[in-house]
Amino acid sequence: MMLIIGLGNPGKEYEHTRHNIGFIALENIAKQYETSFSVKKKFHCEIAESTNNGQKLIFVKPTTYMNLSGKSVIAVKTYYNIPLEKIFVIHDDIDLELGKIKFKTGGGNGGHNGLKSIDGIIENNYHRIRIGVGRPQNSQDVADYVLNNFSKTEYVIAEQAIDKITDNFNLILENKLEEFKSKMV
């Protein structure tokens, strides 16, 4: 069993924001496994389930807003009894250039409030797929920056990163994590 979480904020107003690239990527991956999301209030999320070669896949989009993502993650993790090494979190990262992807296990939260929330509840030794959204230009506030929509040009670059993750996601399912990591460069 594997738990794949995309971080973002619920609601139409956040749908195409930089902070929601985790939701966007997760939806793209889930589509590949012919599943759709439904609201599960007891888990504080939208959830989709599928199987691949006998392995159950659970896709989660927390509905708690970014800063409380851990509440949803712990609810699903506990219910399904999923170990940390089978948890993958997809999220935006302002410390990476737009469209760059990094895969890592464990580590700090880099100031990301969604990761802070998760780390505060389940430890931090889970896998992360970090998608670069870049830093704000000039003196723009970081919160305003990540809560703004991508420009059309930026969205094309973000979609290319999402496609790269989706096209290689089977490597994660096959437990070829180093190979997945090398393909993200």
Swiss-Prot record:
Belongs to the PTH family. It catalyses: an N-acyl-L-alpha-aminoacyl-tRNA + H2O = an N-acyl-L-amino acid + a tRNA + H(+). InterPro entries: Pept_tRNA_hydro, Pept_tRNA_hydro_CS, Pept_tRNA_hydro_sf. This is Peptidyl-tRNA hydrolase. NCBIfam families: pth (TIGR00447). GO terms for biological process: protein quality control for misfolded or incompletely synthesized proteins; rescue of stalled ribosome. Its EC number is 3.1.1.29. Hydrolyzes ribosome-free peptidyl-tRNAs (with 1 or more amino acids incorporated), which drop off the ribosome during protein synthesis, or as a result of ribosome stalling. Catalyzes the release of premature peptidyl moieties from peptidyl-tRNA molecules trapped in stalled 50S ribosomal subunits, and thus maintains levels of free tRNAs and 50S ribosomes. CDD domains: PTH. Keywords: Cytoplasm, Hydrolase, RNA-binding, tRNA-binding. GO terms for cellular component: cytoplasm. It is found in: Cytoplasm. The record marks D92 as: Stabilizes the basic form of H active site to accept a proton. The lineage of its organism: Bacteria, Pseudomonadati, Pseudomonadota, Alphaproteobacteria, Rickettsiales. The keyword RNA-binding applies. Signal peptide: none annotated. The keyword Hydrolase applies. The record marks N9 as: Discriminates between blocked and unblocked aminoacyl-tRNA. Its main location: cytoplasm. The gene is pth. Monomer. PANTHER family: PEPTIDYL-TRNA HYDROLASE (PTHR17224:SF1). The active site is at H19.
